[in-house]
Swiss-Prot record:
The encoding gene: aroB
GO-annotated cellular components: cytoplasm
Native organism: Thermobifida fusca (strain YX)
Residues annotated as signal peptide: none
UniProt-annotated binding residues for NAD(+): 71-76, 105-109, 129-130, 142, 151
Name under which the protein is recorded: 3-dehydroquinate synthase
Cofactors named for this entry: Co(2+); Zn(2+); NAD(+)
Length: 368
């Protein structure tokens, strides 16, 4: 059993993201000797994946209680968080006890948020069971829940005590969810690691399979990109903003679809939008925009969204968490692995970029 440990620093308590097959046995060492109780937060649809986590921790001597929550984005609601706070209180959960989050990105976001807010902060260990969770949501310490006004508007920076990425959980993932996670892998390639793009382009079909020839390398490279960025900028005061490539429009699409649209699918469209913005601003050429479309489409990700949605999307973008005052900020590229911030783009520029994404712009690069 080969285990890879990717260190994440930038805090007084650095931690490892552990990657491998059949590695749930790493959990007791991460929980440690001081904890007596372990709360295992998991989607109510993933009891079979939470069960071995609970069994390993019980065997190690901990008082374990599972806390099922709704699946997906429905879990990231203040009512769900309040219910978990109540159950932690009923269990006399103390500051030395530990919360373990098992599931996809929405579940690990929620588990981290509850850990950050209970008793002003208890340790969290995250066990992502989706590709999206492994390469993005579980790494970096950003936690949050949604409101009616937008996604992740209430949250905290609360780095986990450890992240365990057991690759054995991926083969049972629905294909659409796995492909959605690839959007974040590809994003890491565009903002920091061109080798990721080369690997996907060399064999797109293999990239869509958990047992693909380069699957583990793609996952580890994407995690390493995020680990490096968040180690340098935990609280998103500077460099960490680049991780939001594609997310400004992507989050707006998710809200427009009432969070029923896969995160990765929305981010895929958002990256093409950001690339079109960069092209229109004179930063990149049409060939790089076309490369975005080609790579994303080659693994089954969408690159277009409906034309009539722009007014609602524009209004949502204005409350994006990256906005400074009244100034909109978009992560764009000056080149592959050369991210930058485009601040204050005009409404006309935004509309023109969106026309290209909706497929009706006369100057959109033809990649069909």
């Amino acid at each position: 059993m080969t285990v890879t440990r990717i260190g994440v620093g930038g805090t007084s308590t650095p931690y490892d993201v552990v990657v491998g097959n059949g590695i749930l046995g790493e959990l007791p060492a991460l929980v440690g000797e001081r904890a007596q109780r372990v709360a295992v937060i998991h989607p109510d649809t993933l009891e079979e994946k939470a069960r071995p986590v609970c069994e390993i921790l019980r065997t190690a001597g901990y008082d374990v209680f599972p806390l099922p929550v709704p699946d997906g984005e429905a879990a990231k609601d203040v009512s769900v968080a309040a219910d978990l706070w109540a159950r932690l209180g009923q269990a006399a959960f103390t500051r030395t006890d530990v919360i373990v989050g098992v599931g996809g990105g929405a579940t690990t976001d929620l588990a981290g948020f509850v850990a950050a807010t209970w008793l002003r902060g208890v340790r969290a260990i995250l066990v992502p069971t989706t590709l999206l969770g492994m390469v993005d949501a579980a790494v970096g310490g950003k936690t949050g829940i949604n409101t009616a006004e937008g996604k992740n508007l209430v949250g905290a920076f609360h780095p986990p005590a450890g992240v365990v990425c057991d690759l054995d959980t991926l083969p049972s993932l629905p294909r659409e969810d796995y492909i959605g996670g690839l959007a974040e892998v590809i994003k890491a390639g565009f903002i920091a690691d061109p080798v990721i793009l080369d690997l996907v382009e060399a064999d797109p079909e293999a990239a869509t399979r958990p047992d693909g020839a380069h699957t583990r390398e793609l996952i580890e490279r994407a995690i390493a990109v995020k680990a490096e960025v968040v180690s340098a900028d935990l609280r998103e005061s500077g460099r960490r903003e680049i991780l939001n490539y594609g997310h400004t429009l992507g989050h707006a699409i998710e809200r427009a679809e009432n969070y029923t649209f896969r995160h990765g699918y929305a981010i895929s469209i958002g990256m093409v939008f950001a690339a079109e913005l960069a092209r229109l601003d004179g930063r990149i050429d049409a060939a790089l925009v076309a490369r975005h479309r080609r790579i994303l489409e080659s693994v089954g990700l969408p690159v277009r969204y409906r034309a009539d949605a722009w007014p609602a999307l524009r209004d949502t973008i204005r409350v994006d968490k990256k906005t400074r005052g009244a100034t909109l900020r978009f992560v764009v590229l000056d080149d592959v692995a050369a991210p930058a911030i485009l601040a204050g783009p005009s409404d006309a520029l935004l509309a023109q970029a969106y026309q290209a994404v909706s497929g009706v712009a006369p100057d959109a690069p033809d990649t069909d």
